[in-house]
Amino acid sequence: MIRPKVLFLCSGNSCRTQMAEAFLRDMGGDRFEPLSAGAEAAEMLDPDAVAAMLEVGLDISGQQPKRIDPFMRERVSYLVTLCEREIERTCPIFPGAFWRLKWPIENPATANDRDEHRALVRRARDEIREHVIRFVQEHS
């Protein structure tokens, strides 16, 4: 059975798309092939994203930020952007997708201080989890 590829894209691939990839891997089982990338790959995962995912029982510490470039020639069934395009000018455009979905999740990097950043990461995590739940229900 060929699993549909689901590519999650954002600006840096350090937080939101990493969480989405992990949630789909967990909730979708072997029904999907989750991937994630960013216009620019961050140097490392956002430590607050790693901590927030551990709070819900998922360990993303072994995942690495990836640039979109290696995926540009791939065909994917679903492209999911997690950017607020109006704000994030670096949100990538991807030509090889059959279906395109937009989940406008606020970028925690816009936080003014560490406490606000942690709160935004948790809110993003919870919003992404709800989106993934609906995605799995609608596309399984």
Each language-model region and where it sits:
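Short polar/charged helix/loop
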Residues: 1-140
